A protein has these predicted regions:
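Functionalized membrane-embedded alpha-helices
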Residues: 2-25, 50-91
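Interfacial helix-start motif at the membrane-water boundary
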Residues: 42-60, 116-120
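Membrane-embedded alpha-helical segments of integral membrane proteins
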Residues: 86-138
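Internal/C-terminal transmembrane anchor helices
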Residues: 142-169
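Membrane-interface segments at or immediately adjacent to transmembrane helices
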Residues: 159-220, 227-239
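Thiol-/selenol-based redox modules, centered on thioredoxin-like
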Residues: 177-183, 306-353
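Short, internal strand/loop/helix patches
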Residues: 252, 269-288
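A short, hydrophobic beta-strand/beta-hairpin element that forms part of a small beta-sheet core
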Residues: 291-306
């Protein structure tokens, strides 16, 4: 029975840790999910804190998961996990009854569950929790070495949170991930299917130019919050657009704003002459970084950069001269390996140390 209780606790820990880490890797996506929950609960007045709430919840999930895996502070961690699981079970039961058009966001963009699937998942977690922690006064003592492995894992998770807040996700699970091929809105059966990578754009007069995304080598800068861009960031965008044009790319800016706001925000002709307008949520999905860039080759999303790491002209020339398949692999496999290495390292610390 002791082994069964320990295995149950570790299984819950894995679920919590993975759920937290996936949301930590994509803080913008986690914030969007929290905003959806706040809207559903009629608590939109808290939207200004959505980012903090999302990151805080993700960090708490990951740390509680690490605590269960390592076995430290079992009673406190067990109570906290039990309360959280019970709360989310009640919330998902309410979601199941109301069936709003929203995703649970349990595992970020990696895994999408229906409300019923989420409810069943939480019920299973509750059953495992009861098996692992009841009665609370009969929990096994923790090996002393685990009080060393947990802080190492915790510091690593916090460091990953800080890193993720400054970059785009190491692994992109959105419909607009590298390797995805854009589709025209008229070519899909269900226009409400958010998992299909469609992007519609128009000029200042409202005329649509969706076909432009299917033509040639595009360097697309996406701006979903014009007001938050600083002068030095505008300078970086202008430099990228100049370098892209000089290297043979078609520079394009997609903004979730009105033409008048764009003209008030910048006077650079490199930006204004290349600007089209698109849906804010689509731009957030295309690139999590406000002012980030995406290389699109004849409708194929090749790679992306955040505003802090925009490519220089030498990098653009390298990509332009390379085979698109090679670029797709070389530009994205490195980040995927970094994420896998991070997970292996943290799990090794928690399980083997």
């Amino acid at each position: 029975m002791r082994i069964i209780r320990r295995i149950s606790a570790v299984l819950i820990g894995f679920v919590f840790f993975l759920a937290g880490i996936l949301k930590i890797m994509d803080p913008v996506g986690a914030r969007l999910v929290v905003e959806e929950y706040l809207k559903f609960l009629h608590m939109g007045w808290l939207n200004g804190l959505a980012g903090v709430l999302a990151s805080g919840m993700a960090l708490l999930e990951a740390l509680l998961g690490a605590a269960l895996i390592t076995g430290v502070w079992r009673k406190v961690a067990g109570l906290a996990v039990g309360v959280m699981t019970a709360f989310f079970t009640l919330l998902t039961f309410f979601l199941y009854l109301k069936n709003p058009h929203m995703d649970c966001g349990c595992f970020g963009e990696m895994i999408h569950l229906t409300h019923l699937q989420t409810l069943l998942k939480n019920i299973i977690l509750l059953a495992l929790w009861a098996l692992a922690f009841l009665p609370l006064n009969k929990l096994e003592p923790t090996r002393k070495v685990k009080y060393v492995s947990f802080p190492i894992a915790a510091v690593s998770v916090v460091g990953f949170l800080l890193y993720s807040s400054l970059t785009i996700p190491l692994v992109d699970f959105t419909p607009f991930k590298p390797g995805a091929e854009l589709m025209l809105p008229e070519d899909i059966d269900d226009p409400n299917d958010e998992r299909t990578p469609t992007l519609s754009l128009s000029d200042a007069s409202g005329e649509y130019f969706d076909d432009l995304l299917m033509e040639g080598d595009l360097m697309v800068v996406s701006i979903y919050d014009v007001a938050k861009l600083k002068p030095r960031q505008w300078d970086k965008i202008v430099k990228l657009l100049q370098d892209a044009a000089a290297t043979g790319y078609k520079p394009m800016v997609l903004a979730a704003a009105s033409p008048s706001i764009m003209q008030e925000s910048t006077s650079a002709p490199e930006v204004l002459d290349a600007t089209y307008y698109a849906d804010r949520k689509k731009l957030l999905t295309l690139n999590r970084s406000n002012g980030g860039a995406s290389y699109i080759q004849e409708g194929l999303i090749v790679t992306k950069w955040g505003i802090r790491g925009l490519p220089d002209q030498e990098k653009l020339q390298e990509l332009a001269s390379a085979d698109v398949t090679e670029s797709l692999l070389s530009e994205n496999n490195g980040d995927r390996l970094k994420f896998q290495a991070f997970l292996l390292y943290v799990f090794a610390v928690m399980l083997l140390l």
